Amino acid sequence: MSNAPFMQEVARRRTFAIISHPDAGKTTITEKVLLFGQAIQTAGTVKGRGSNQHAKSDWMEMEKQRGISITTSVMQFPYRGSLVNLLDTPGHEDFSEDTYRTLTAVDCCLMVIDAAKGVEDRTRKLMEVTRLRDTPILTFMNKLDRDIRDPMEVMDEVESELKIACAPITWPVGCGKLFKGVYHLYKDETYLYQSGKGHTIQEVRIVKGLGNPELDAAIGDELAAQLRDELELVQGASHEFDRDAFLNGKLSPVFFGTALGNFGVDHMLDGLVEWAPSPMPRNTDLRTVTATDEKFTGFVFKIQANMDPKHRDRVAFMRVVSGKYEKGMKLRQVRTGKDVVIADALTFMAGDRSHVEEAYPGDIIGLHNHGTIQIGDTFTQGENMKFTGIPNFAPELFRRIRLRDPLKQKQLLKGLVQLSEEGAVQVFRPVHNNDLIVGAVGVLQFDVVVARLKSEYNVEAIYEAINVSTARWVECDDVKKFDEFQRKNEINLALDGGDNLTYIAPTMVNLNITQERYPDVVFRKTREH
């Protein structure tokens, strides 16, 4: 078998996720990207509650009601000879653990920034996660059709707060009502903006050359002079694009535009397919696996319940790392040691499923899961190794959960353990009593859990406040010291959904004192799946 077609398929894959603060325009940009990839015909801007026109990528019932993207969905589309896999990440205040983990399955990220607001809190947190693997970052400065902050100032803020150099690729011509387009620094072209064309791909008028008198005629003498002055400053003060620095996560190419007006998104996509890496190598506990390895390997980074309300199923999302998936192939689930035939893997267009005949490195496929697959599971063609770097994050918010009907304790526990396996929430059972504590990274996760317990497990649960401030997974090599630690701290110990011992601290002060008191015990903020 000639290897050339396989190598070609690997080389043309680009797998990325979008990170942003809520309401920076992530869902809108997702829509426009799909429009350019011809995955959808018209972009249905995400409407508020009660509207029946919903964004293609927000499909779970609760998302439809709230107009937010709760679950990570996956969309694949062709663009300029490349095949792009876009992993949509929840952008709302919460759902962050899912979002964090999704970032472990991509080779590149697009950071969307609201240019009127600059760097916001959630963007900071997500960027921290991308730093764990030095993921390459592209930046899109959004909402230029509104009044924005000085673009130079916003770029400086990104550089100082997120510790990444910025290299502007395009530069805005005016903003708000005076927004006239963008100038491309490397092509020496100005693209002129027309408002009201956001739902389709517009024919853009291009003016070649910064000194072209046509430019003055198109945007006015004053704005043209301002643009030339700004660009002189920008070219003197900012970084030039350097692909190696980009691939090492040290420098981000910056694009300007308006996702709502569908302007500038294509420049970013062009940059993505031209500069972003094809599928990258991944570490396992035994060796590094490269995408062009002949044998199939992949890991599960997310489990999604009820993608199909008609069937009560769960789907495990698997990132293909190496080799080629073919329908009906036998794979080993390393954690259980079982060999399974995968005949019905799925590919996605957010909620629209289609069965996949083959998949290549960089692709995301869905495996039907009846409770046997967990986050972090590695699948191979027989090799016993495990991919590393798929973390669990210590929750920051806690509630005690209890039943309205005490007879349904068994269903409650089953529901919570399953929801924790798919990463919707973490569950802790204190060692010294029968409480059930739910831990999350954001408040909205609590609502999701109660709603899903009701609809999927027929359990009515309510929350109560609990005096827990943070949690850490604990371990210790010295058995004797660990026994003593457990004996003296029983009241603060719990088991998580995977039966891992956890220290539950009522306050940060308590945690710090306990850590000082037991230097041999390791307190972990993240735990490998």
From Swiss-Prot:
Q: What is its main location?
A: cytoplasm
Molecular-function GO terms, alphabetical: GTP binding; GTPase activity; guanosine tetraphosphate binding; translation release factor activity, codon nonspecific; translation release factor activity, codon specific
- What CDD domains does its record include? RF3, RF3_II, RF3_III
One Pfam family of this chain:
RF3_C
Keywords of the record, alphabetical order, are:
Cytoplasm, GTP-binding, Nucleotide-binding, Protein biosynthesis
Residues annotated as binding GTP: 20-27, 88-92, 142-145
Give start and end of each tr-type G domain: 11-280
Keyword GTP-binding annotated: yes
Set out the biological process GO terms recorded for this chain's protein.
regulation of translational termination
What GO cellular component entries does it have? cytosol
Q: Where in the cell is it found?
A: Cytoplasm
Physiological role? Increases the formation of ribosomal termination complexes and stimulates activities of RF-1 and RF-2. It binds guanine nucleotides and has strong preference for UGA stop codons. It may interact directly with the ribosome. The stimulation of RF-1 and RF-2 is significantly reduced by GTP and GDP, but not by GMP.
UniProt similarity note: Belongs to the TRAFAC class translation factor GTPase superfamily. Classic translation factor GTPase family. PrfC subfamily.
For this protein, the record's HAMAP family field holds: Rel_fac_3 (MF_00072)
The name under which this protein is listed is Peptide chain release factor 3
Report the source organism: Erwinia tasmaniensis (strain DSM 17950 / CFBP 7177 / CIP 109463 / NCPPB 4357 / Et1/99)
Q: Which gene encodes it?
A: prfC
